[in-house]
Structures are given as structure tokens and as C-alpha cells.
Design a protein with these regions (language model features):
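Alpha-helical recognition segments enriched in aromatics with Gly/Pro capping
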Residues: 49-52, 59-180
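N-terminal Rossmann-like or analogous alpha/beta NTP/dinucleotide-binding catalytic cores
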Residues: 1-54, 64, 156-159
Length: 180
């Protein structure tokens, strides 16, 4: 369909639907926010508090061990987010990684074996941390979300906001399913 990514495709559909009903929207790209460094401070904060971040995440997700680092560097060789973070340098805002692969949805995604260094702008936070990070970066004070997020995603986001970022989460609004 001519879009560069899955996200770009669905963003275009949303923008088109909003335009059809006369709702003005401002579309922001997380990729661009990371690339411009707008997430640098929150990435540094999560990585600085990674022991606390691990403890909070373990309340919601199995398999969080003492080696878990809440950042996914994009491999410079294969461009995948299949890396294990080996070290963090908060001063230079970089991580050292190895592209080892990961398991997702019961499937193994192979890594290419490359080892390298990435800046905080060359990766992303895992989604459970990224959502509350967006609240901080974008100054979100009201957050609507589908009912499917009310029992898992939202409670973990609240917990991370309060106990990792030390902010109050936005006012929530749960909605039913809707179609555009």
C-alpha cells in the first residue's frame, strides 16, 4: 500500500477516518521522537532505575530475571530489536548489545549474532515502559484506552508511572470497541 511500516499504514487509516468526520488530530511518531532525542531523558531514567523497573515489571510479566534491561537496541547489522543489552553507559547515553534473538508469541526470532553499541536514539523502551514514558514526554493528562487494556496494560502503566517515573498517571477513560 506504499507505506514504510505497519505503524505508518494504520496511522494513515486513522488520519483518513478522522478527516472524514471532521476531527482535527495531530499525529506524532514515536520513531521520530526517539530519533530527535525526546525520549533520551526517560530512557536514562528507566535504565538508571533498572532494578526498580525489573521489580515492577515482574509483578505483571513472567521471566523477568536479574539480567533483564528494559531497553531494546536496534541491531546495526540486521535492524531487528532482537538484542540483549550487555552494559549501559548513562553518561554517553549508550548501550552495548548482542543480537541474540528473542521469543515472541511462542516463536523464536533469530538474532544475527552482531555485537555493537547503540545510542538511546537507536532503540526503544519495551511497550510497558514506553506507554508511561509517553505520558511524561508528551505531558499527557487524559488517556482513553480500550477495555482490553483495563486489567493488564493500564495497571502496569500506573505502577510504572508512580514507582519508576515518580509521576501521577493521566486520568483514564475506558471505552468499548469501536470501528472506523
Amino acid at each position: 500500500d506504499g507505506h514504510d511500516s505497519y505503524g505508518a499504514h494504520f496511522s494513515a487509516l486513522l488520519a483518513e477516518s478522522a478527516d472524514m468526520v471532521g476531527v482535527p488530530i495531530e499525529m506524532l511518531s514515536n520513531t521520530e521522537l526517539y530519533e530527535r532525542g525526546e525520549f533520551d531523558a526517560v530512557v536514562a531514567e528507566v535504565l538508571d532505575k533498572r532494578d526498580r523497573a525489573r521489580a515492577v515489571l515482574a509483578d505483571y510479566q513472567a521471566g523477568v530475571d536479574e539480567d533483564y534491561v528494559p531497553f531494546m537496541a536496534q541491531c546495526a547489522e540486521c535492524q531487528r530489536l532482537t538484542t540483549d543489552i550487555r552494559s549501559v553507559d548513562l553518561e554517553t547515553k549508550t548501550v552495548e548489545y548482542a543480537c541474540t534473538g528473542l521469543e515472541a508469541g511462542g516463536q523464536q526470532i533469530e538474532g544475527c549474532g552482531h555485537e555493537g553499541t547503540a545510542t538511546f536514539r537507536e532503540g526503544k523502551l519495551p511497550w510497558r515502559f514506553e506507554w508511561p514514558a509517553q505520558w511524561r514526554v508528551l505531558g499527557v493528562d487524559f488517556e482513553p484506552f480500550g477495555k482490553d487494556h483495563a486489567e493488564g496494560s493500564w495497571p502496569s502503566g500506573e505502577h510504572i508511572a508512580r514507582d519508576v517515573f515518580e509521576i501521577e498517571p493521566p486520568v483514564p477513560m475506558v471505552y468499548e470497541w469501536f470501528t472506523l
